[in-house]
Amino acid sequence: MPPSTRSRQRPAPADVGPTLDLDRYVPAFITFIANKLSNSATAFYQKQFGVNVTEWRIMSLLAIEPGIPASRICHVIGFDKGPVSRTLAGLEKRGLVSIRTDPDDGRTHSISLTARGRATHDKVIVAAFEREKRLLSCLSKDEREVLIDLLRRLHENLGAVTDSSYG
């Protein structure tokens, strides 16, 4: 068996090339916050309500926009079709959503919360608002408004880095 290449590879010196300042690099901050919020939400929502954070995101969108197709869910929450489709199948199997084929276009489906799904949503949303309140408790009301405005502007500017023509 050939010797492991791990022992022969030397790490690059720390002072070679640029590095990120993780205290100032905005994409890292956003990613770290999102990951930690998502992981803790999944653990909490799963334990308390039997839904994970992806299921909750979809259910919350369906409460706002009942009867939408999966493509709309993908667009709004920024997930690929595969994970959304699998999540919807699980929600349907558990009786939380209803998926109906559009009679005018058999390729399109209308997705809505069932009564059971709406009841679950109505329990989870109370906890979601409480988590948001606790997260933002370190900010004044004015700072919260500024944060929301800045996040909205960043969201609207995502095309600057997600556009397929961007290198």
Region roles according to the model:
Residues H155-D163:
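A short alpha/beta connector and helix-capping loop motif
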Residues Y25, R57, G82, R134, ...:
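Active-site phosphate/pyrophosphate-handling residues
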